Each structure stands twice: as C-alpha cells, then as structure tokens.
C-alpha cells in the first residue's frame, strides 16, 4: 500500500458550520476526514482539485502525469510510449483525463493516440470504506504532441455524531485533473 492508503489527514471539531462566504481549499498528500462531535453544516465550498497533466510539442523524453494528492492517484506518463494512470481504475489507454465521482474525460487526439479516463472505484454501502481517491488518467502516446494524464480527484469523508447538512449553496468539488492537451502551445 502507498502512504495515501495508510494515512488520513483528520480535522476534528466540536461543531462545524461553514457559511456561504467560506471556501476551504485542501492541499497535501493524504485523503481528508472532517469529523464533528455534534453537527456539520456546509453552506460554503470544499475544494480538492487534482493536478492537471502536462503537454509536450517536441520529440524525445516524456512527461510525468499530474501529481498524486489528497488520496487520488497520479496520472500516467506521456511520451512515445504512454503509460496507464495509477489507481484501481486508472486509465488504460493513453491520454485520458482523471476521474472524480463517476466521471472522467477522454484524452485529446491530435497526432497522438487519445486515451481512456480513469474511473472512480467506491462502495457507498460500506460505512467503513477505505479512503481511496480517484484514479489517474492515462498518459498520451505519440511522436510529437503528447499529453500526460491528469491526477485522480481526492478522497473526503464527512462524519458527525449529529447531522451532516449541505445547504442549497454548498459545493463539494473533488475534480480529477485534466489530461495534458496536445494542441496547446
């Protein structure tokens, strides 16, 4: 197992109330657990955006995928021979965007092979679920214009002794990174 599978960043509160003007941007290596001894009410924003893949327009070498963070897996290496994204559902064919929830984007195809997105892997019926973020998208494969895969979205757990309430304006964003765009630049 990786460090992100063994450790969780824990934030513990007596009672948590995030107003509409509050945005919390999480960064770091580990998945995040927000715990409350009473209630959790979120009217603001919780943001855990993963790193995008990169792109290259000249031959030779390659590109690392979007860096793993917040429990999400790294994107695949892009180059002459693209690599799959990391994680349980990592993109298998070159060039994909990373996953978040059940979504991911196919990679760009402009003189290189486009690829599969990573997929999310989770079981909502298990209250003792492992904190596993999204899988990385695969890296692009081509001779000149290639992009690496985006990193998978992070993992977040909200748990309280009382209620967890999401207000009408609440936003929880755990997007996977975009795959590197071979047409940019």
Question: What function would you assign to each model-found segment?
Answer:
Residues 2-19, 25-38:
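Extracellular beta-strand-rich solenoid/capping regions of secreted or surface-exposed proteins
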Residues 1-7, 30, 39-185:
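Glycine-centric low-complexity/flexibility signal
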């Amino acid at each position: 197992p990786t460090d992100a599978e063994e450790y969780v960043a824990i934030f513990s509160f007596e009672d948590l109330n995030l107003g509409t003007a509050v945005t919390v941007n999480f960064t770091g290596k580990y998945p995040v657990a927000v715990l409350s001894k009473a209630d959790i009410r979120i009217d603001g924003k919780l943001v855990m955006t993963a790193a995008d893949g990169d792109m290259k327009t000249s031959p030779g070498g390659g590109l690392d995928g979007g860096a793993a963070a917040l429990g999400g897996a790294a994107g695949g290496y892009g180059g002459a021979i693209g690599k799959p994204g990391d994680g349980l559902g990592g993109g298998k064919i070159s060039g994909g965007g990373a996953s978040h929830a059940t979504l991911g984007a196919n990679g760009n195809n402009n003189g290189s092979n486009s690829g599969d997105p990573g997929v999310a892997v989770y079981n909502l019926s298990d209250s003792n679920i492992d904190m596993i973020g999204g899988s990385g998208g695969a890296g692009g494969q081509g001779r000149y214009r290639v992009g690496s895969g985006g990193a998978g979205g992070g993992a977040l757990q909200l748990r309280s002794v009382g209620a967890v309430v999401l207000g009408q304006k609440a936003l929880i964003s755990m997007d996977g990174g975009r795959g590197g765009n071979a047409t940019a630049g």
